[in-house]
């Protein structure tokens, strides 16, 4: 494929934008470098770049675009918002409609508040949990990404009962010491952390199904045990459902798994492609939020009509009968096709697939936590990513990210993708 215009534009972007991208995940650092492709437009399941190349897209903007690009129902809603004014700074009736839709889909959301992003939603749930419990520390799980605010840019110390250390320049040591990081799916380490720091722990922050070191399900009984132990300790449980809400069913991963948190943070899908976040939970906890309580959260753009109307339209599309069954069918087809191609060419892969989301790890070992994900072969993934791009398949440029199937993908797209995998695996073996 010709990528000359993408290269020209990236060179120009480097002169004006830090690193040439507005989010580091858009660079190709995670796949060994190279020029990120600059896209011109998108429609349905397809991307079209500035050089005129067409791709089947599984990036889906890192998750939000579950209905495909430029879905007509969502486009109509956004157009209506633009015609009527995109920002008021006042309440609107649409906020009420959307809040009711979220509550009906995810019953643990007894009260809801809108924010501008998933990062803001998670950040505020922690603040609210601290206000409710009068405690300061949180427990999080290694490799789970919860946004780019200081408190969650923390990695594990030397063991499960040690305090965290900064995972980014600019995060202070004192901030990191408010966080205890333990391995996902490791109940013994979680118990040890609670035993050490329990009376200081305001909340346990967890992705109920991990989406940030690939798609990883909780071990049987893991989330139930977290709930029980946290509540015995007087701590709250916060689910970060920024990736998982409405991903596996019409509702949250908590509905899908049957385990209920105290607070939930959401983003991505619920905006239909526009910036949004939301959080909610038990009434007694949510009433700690201003103007009813002492925990402050505000935002000029929070609840803006464009994002709210886009979100309403997205959820309306997701109520289509049989849609999640189709996600499951296509997800299973992809997993099966990739695994068969890997066996055919003697390439070790593990595919974690949950409904319409999957991750291809280059390893013959199961992946159940961040350490295991980190041990997979990143060099092979980089070659695979670049090979798939040349075959017209757009993936996220990181071995830790998921593929997302949208309502716009067809069976023909899935079969074409499987053929591309076969072709790329063959080239990878040939070019050893």
Swiss-Prot record:
UniProt-listed InterPro entries: 4pyrrol_synth_GluAld_NH2Trfase, Aminotrans_3, Aminotrans_3_PPA_site, PyrdxlP-dep_Trfase, PyrdxlP-dep_Trfase_major, PyrdxlP-dep_Trfase_small
Catalytic function, reaction form: (S)-4-amino-5-oxopentanoate = 5-aminolevulinate
Species: Listeria welshimeri serovar 6b (strain ATCC 35897 / DSM 20650 / CCUG 15529 / CIP 8149 / NCTC 11857 / SLCC 5334 / V8)
Record EC number: 5.4.3.8
Cofactor dependency: pyridoxal 5'-phosphate
Record PROSITE patterns: AA_TRANSFER_CLASS_3
Modified residues (N6-(pyridoxal phosphate)lysine): 268
Protein name, per record: Glutamate-1-semialdehyde 2,1-aminomutase 2
Keywords: Cytoplasm, Isomerase, Porphyrin biosynthesis, Pyridoxal phosphate
Matches recorded under Gene3D superfamilies: Aspartate Aminotransferase, domain 1, Type I PLP-dependent aspartate aminotransferase-like (Major domain)
Pfam family, one: Aminotran_3
Gene field: hemL2
Annotated compartments: Cytoplasm
Entry's family note: Belongs to the class-III pyridoxal-phosphate-dependent aminotransferase family. HemL subfamily.
Enzyme class: isomerase
